[in-house]
Regions:
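Helix-loop boundary and gating motifs at the non-cytosolic
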Residues: 8-57, 235-239, 247-261
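Symmetry-related core transmembrane helices of the 12-TM Major Facilitator Superfamily/SLC fold
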Residues: 169-185, 392-408
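Structural signature of the two symmetry-related core transmembrane helices
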Residues: 79-92, 297-312
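Core transmembrane helices of Major Facilitator Superfamily
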Residues: 28, 109-121, 332-344
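Helix-to-loop junctions at the C-terminal end of transmembrane segments
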Residues: 63-75, 282-295
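Helix-breaking motifs and short loop linkers at transmembrane-helix boundaries and internal kinks
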Residues: 43, 75, 96-101, 294, ...
Length: 420
């Protein structure tokens, strides 16, 4: 932004980015906890329900590859509008799905849209938020996203009661994405609100905003970048994949657990929504811990807590108070996840080469998303072969090993308190 532009404030991006993000995440928050429930209602086994829930993460992983080129070609705001429209199509497909396979395709498409929306909003912030405000804006964006993930399930409770089924709650995704589209379409041009931005021109190409250029660089030559940085990605990137895997396993296992215990659809949404409130409440604390004490004091306790929460689930499924233990485990997992808020983005920023960070950050994000995509498939496979308790126990063991791995690797690559 140029010096002649109007004075910037964080509130100026509230309607442009924060409100569409809140609406999109409310829709996702309403839908995600009920995917396994909807799948089993359509006749899927517990294992297949896990696969269908995991299609969201698989879609995000696949969407990582073309999303940068798409955002660079059509722009940040148009990409967010397109992603929200595609999400509406996916949500309608989920509502009307006659069988588990159609539901799985709809959830996969939603994952593709989520990848594009996430990159587009990040690119928008890069283009229009001055550097000195960017960390606060991105931190607030993360908090807004987490707020939606706990508001969504709570909104779905009365909708489930009114419609009589889990798929009825998917209408929340449709309505919230439609509202996001209307906001993005009706807003004036961003450069009218924030002033002119410096545009990047390369030979034979049109002008790009800095965010569009960042998006293109992140996805260009992804596999070449993975090979170039194979050393640090094998050591630290594997840690990112483990964190992604633990988070995805939590997202899939909690609803699966509720189904296996016979918890009602409305109560499932309520429990996961309240757990999301705990997660949301800790996102600022995580940033303070990372800045004051070092990245290791966020990454290791978070991963360890996720592992211990999974082990608690594994050993309490068949106890007389299994539902009480389920609620306790959901709370522990949410505290652990909240303590790790922003850790993957922060570690990626710390490790990225300062001169040209975008390609590395694209490879870093892909590595974390690969772990997220793999975890639900592992959970589904173990559930199908053995039981959901064995699946939780295996993921819990991975969490313990992941915490040990991060405790060894982070001090080797990142100072105890970066910037001090």
């Amino acid at each position: 932004m140029t010096d002649g532009n109007p004075a910037f404030s964080i509130r100026s991006v509230a309607v442009v980015v924060f409100l569409p993000t809140l609406l999109f995440s409310i829709g996702e928050g309403a839908l995600i906890p009920l995917i396994p429930v909807a799948a089993t209602n359509l006749g899927a086994s517990l294992a297949i329900a896990g696969v269908i829930a995991g299609m969201l993460m698989i879609g995000e992983l696949v969407g990582d590859i073309p999303s940068g080129a798409l955002v660079s070609r059509i722009g940040e705001r148009t990409s967010m509008i397109g992603a929200a429209l595609l999400s509406i199509v996916a949500a309608l497909g989920a509502v009307l799905a006659p069988n588990p396979w159609v539901l799985g395709v709809a959830i996969f498409i939603l994952g593709l849209a989520t990848a594009v929306f996430a990159l587009a909003r990040h690119a928008f912030m890069t283009s229009y938020v001055p550097l000195r405000y960017r960390a606060r804006a991105l931190s607030t964006l993360g908090g807004v996203f987490r707020a939606g993930l706990f508001i969504g399930p709570l909104l779905s409770v009365p909708v489930i009661h009114f419609t009589g089924g889990a798929q009825g709650a998917f209408w929340i995704m449709t309505i919230s994405c439609l509202a996001a589209v209307l906001i993005l379409v009706l807003l004036p041009d961003p450069e009218t609100l924030f002033g002119q931005v410096h545009r990047v021109r390369k030979s034979g190409a049109s002008d790009h905003t800095p965010g569009e250029e960042l998006a293109a660089e992140e996805s260009h030559g992804l596999f070449r970048t993975l090979w170039r940085f194979r050393g640090v990605l094998a050591r630290m990137g594997s840690g990112a994949a483990l964190i992604g895997a633990m988070r995805a396993a939590r997202t899939v296992l909690l609803p699966l657990w509720a189904v296996s215990l016979g918890v009602s659809e409305a109560n499932t949404a309520l429990i996961i929504g309240l757990a999301g409130a705990v997660d949301f409440a800790l996102f600022y604390v995580s940033g303070q811990v990372m800045d004051r004490f070092g990245r290791i004091w966020s990454a290791v306790p978070s991963t360890l807590g996720l592992g211990l929460g999974m082990l608690l689930l594994a050993f309490t499924h068949d106890t007389p108070n299994a539902v009480v233990w389920f609620i306790a485990a959901a709370g522990i997992l949410s505290v652990a996840n909240g303590l790790g808020s922003g850790i993957l983005m922060t570690l990626g920023a710390d490790l990225a080469p300062p001169g040209r960070p975008a390609p590395f950050l694209g490879a870093w994000r892909f590595t974390g998303d690969a772990g997220s995509a793999a975890a639900p498939l592992v959970v589904a496979a173990i559930t199908g072969l053995l039981s959901v308790s064995f699946a939780a126990g295996a993921i819990g063991a991975v969490g313990i090993l992941g915490a040990w791995h991060l405790a060894r690797m982070i001090p080797r690559y990142i100072p105890a308190r970066p910037g001090r």
